[in-house]
Amino acid sequence: MAKHLYKTPIPSTRKGTLDRQVKSNPRNNLIHGRHRCGKGRNSRGIITASIEGEVIKRLYRKIDFRRNQKDISGRIVTIESDPNRNAYICLIHYGDGEKRYILHPRGAIIGDTIVSGTKVPISMGNALPLTDMPLGTVMHNKENTRGRGGQLARAAGAVAKHKAKEGKMATLRLPSGEGRIVTQNSLATVGQEGKVGVNQKSLGRAGSKCWLGKRPVVRGVVMNPVDHPHGGGEGKAPIGRKKPTTPWGYPALGRRTRKRKKYSDSFILRRRK
């Protein structure tokens, strides 16, 4: 990720960074409108997430997560930024005239050729099933089930590693450190996801964060008792409870939110860190 520092005497943007490497100029047939109606409220208008707000107006880019253009070579024409995700996207022109967006593999440049299918070369950006990948291969945009499209390792800089094979199943190490079993006939894209180091970007000011739908975070201990269970007291007072809670009294800071009996529990060999 190429970062550009603001050169300004204004305190709000003095330490902010911009990504000057790519710009977005999407094709009209690969975008559509997207209505965001949440804004941290439920159907009755009651606040359910106090740190979520309205995001800046944007258009959704149709991303090809399935990579189902089998054995047809495609050429990378542009590398663009996507306001709906923290990773770059690439515009691909296939040999049959099809044009699609895919996630940008790290190191791919304009003019490179990619292909998806079985028995294709194991090179950066190619999509193929795990049966054709040797152990130790790094990948991103991994499918859970054949034909459903990539669901794992899709964030900027994400990478999963092929650890083992047994029968029709394979073992992967995900970016979170979790060990998961997946089917070998499912597709994955070779290489690491691009835009590494996006977590080191400094927004510089609160307005840039509000564009992303993130509102200011206020501690409960500085609120009134009517607004939060931690509120009230004289001066800097403790929360008055054994454990911290949410504004609605539920346990916070460490409570597991995953369903106890989820169908995919049997596919997890090692929990994430």
Swiss-Prot record:
Q: Which gene encodes it?
A: rpl2-A
In the record, biological process GO terms are:
mitochondrial translation
Which is an annotated Pfam family here? Ribosomal_L2_C
Q: Where in the cell is it found?
A: Plastid, Chloroplast
Q: How does it assemble?
A: Part of the 50S ribosomal subunit.
- Which GO terms fall under molecular function for this chain's record? RNA binding; rRNA binding; structural constituent of ribosome; transferase activity
The protein's predominant localisation is: plastid
Q: What segment(s) does the record annotate as region Disordered?
A: 1-25, 225-253
What's the protein name?
Large ribosomal subunit protein uL2cz/uL2cy
Write the record's keywords in alphabetical order, separated by commas. Answer: Chloroplast, Plastid, Ribonucleoprotein, Ribosomal protein
Q: Which organism is it from?
A: Triticum aestivum (Wheat)
Gene3D superfamilies (UniProt xref): 2.30.30.30, Nucleic acid-binding proteins, Ribosomal protein L2, domain 3
Q: Which GO terms describe its cellular component?
A: chloroplast; mitochondrial large ribosomal subunit
Which family does the record assign? Belongs to the universal ribosomal protein uL2 family.
InterPro entries listed in its UniProt record: NA-bd_OB-fold (IPR012340), Rib_uL2_dom2 (IPR014722), Ribosomal_uL2 (IPR002171), Ribosomal_uL2_bac/org-type (IPR005880), Ribosomal_uL2_C (IPR022669), Ribosomal_uL2_CS (IPR022671), Ribosomal_uL2_dom3 (IPR014726), Ribosomal_uL2_RNA-bd_dom (IPR022666)
Q: What is the lineage of its organism?
A: Eukaryota, Viridiplantae, Streptophyta, Embryophyta, Tracheophyta
